[in-house]
Amino acid sequence: MFHSLLVKNFILIDELEIEFNKGLCVITGETGAGKSILLDAILFCLGYKTSNNIIKRGKDYAVVNIIFSLNEEIKNFLIQNFIEPEELLLVKCLQKAEGRKNFFINNQVVNKAIMQQLATYLFELHGQNNNISLLEANTQRDILDSYGNLLDFRAELSKCYQTWQNTRKEIAEITLKQNSIDQEIDYLSFATEELTKLNIQIGEEEKLANIRKDLQNKDKDLQLIKDVLEQINNPEINTSINRAEKLLARQGDNERFEAIATSLEEAYNNLEEARQGLSNLLDSFNYEEYNLEETEERLFLIKAISRKYNVPADELGIFLDKSLEQLGILKNKIANSNELKAQEMLLQKKYYELASDLSVKRLIAAKHLEESLHQELKQLKMAKAIFEIEIIAGKEPTASGNDDIVFKASTNPGMATEAINKIASGGELSRFMLALKTSLFDKMVKPSIIFDEIDVGIGGEVADKVGERLKKLSSVTQVIVITHQPQVAGKADLHIKIEKTQLEKETKVTVKALNLAERQEELARMISGKTITEASLKAAKELLHL
């Protein structure tokens, strides 16, 4: 509910502050006193379109602050929009002379859209030019469902609808991606089969690289041994040594050649020893466990697979596990596709059964609401008005059912009913809304409801009936009424008077909460005009039950 309203430099207002109470609050004042300025200030603060020239002449800014109480719905909205809830809700709009508007919620800057969304949780406004909520199709549907106690049933239908739509979406995604899913399954099937068969182990690449290096070194040594053996196994070497020894032997015991003969003999023996050593070394090479060609083939294969899947060799095992998991998911999607289609058909059937039941319930509720509203309209001097609720099948199923709901009315005898916004004046729309609110009473209650001149064109007993209904409504929500009718004002819990004062160089608007004596005087003025009489004072006293 509204706690307070602070307005500065707004149109004709220098500065004013109003503190509101629970129950019924009436705002009165002479015609042209500026009562509509308060509504403009509220709409301005909450992001709705108002007059372009709202900054008071001679000032460089205008500002409006409103403080509201909180409920859980408002708190949830604030949290969803990353605004910290406090004990009370402070909303503010500041406009500077250059034209820029700044909106604040709890001193946090927000955009206009957020402010307008918040406003829908705070209050309803009904008046000469503001009955938007009644005219919206969603509001009309909510009014009917609330009246018929159908909101829980509608919630069940909505849940079924969401499940149905989610299933349809999942099927559509599978169908749309069928080709890519098939391709991915083929790819993953091949990859997992290939990697499973290769069974590449962690550290295997490094191990094979080291073995390859060792084998390459051994090959070099082997080739060297073979090359040396090839040279020293040359028969000509042995033949040459033997010939040299024989030539020296012919010299007999010639000491001069004895040392040379000994050297030749040692050379022969050393050569034989070298041959034997190289042969033994050759026999010592072991190729049973690893083969360079096979080692290189495996190593190069691992490197190729690593490049192919763009995965480090040591992570190929992890890649295989993830691929197997993804392959299972995709195969399950395909397997579940037919199951989803069957489920979608069942959900569709259930939805239309629930929607059909809801339509029947709405038709029954509509008849009762039409009758209730007709009785209320009689009391509000609209006995000849016809109100009916048209329910027709919608073009598309929705979370709220398969019905298009239109509130229709005729305010003049002989005229066909049309959509309510096309045939009713602002005052009539307000009384339609009051009749609806009275019929609903404790259902669909916003924290505050504002009625702007709901009593235009009525008086006497009808005005008293309007006041009674406003008073009744104020027992479940805060009701703020701008009125010209003393019968309505007399039932107020809080009476605020707006006055316009013409000074020498400017016009000022002031606001005052009236005490009991001041209320009597104001009601007397409303009854008899500027000249207050004893009779009007007496009538005012009776209205106040003094």
From Swiss-Prot:
Alphabetical UniProt keywords: ATP-binding, DNA damage, DNA repair, Nucleotide-binding
Record-linked InterPro entries: DNA_recomb/repair_RecN, P-loop_NTPase, RecF/RecN/SMC_N
One Pfam family per UniProt: SMC_N
MF term (GO), any: ATP binding
CDD domains given in the database record: ABC_RecN
Single biological process term from Gene Ontology: SOS response
GO CC annotation: bacterial nucleoid
Binding site for ATP: 29-36
Protein task: May be involved in recombinational repair of damaged DNA.
Family of the protein in this entry: Belongs to the RecN family.
Name under which the protein is recorded: DNA repair protein RecN
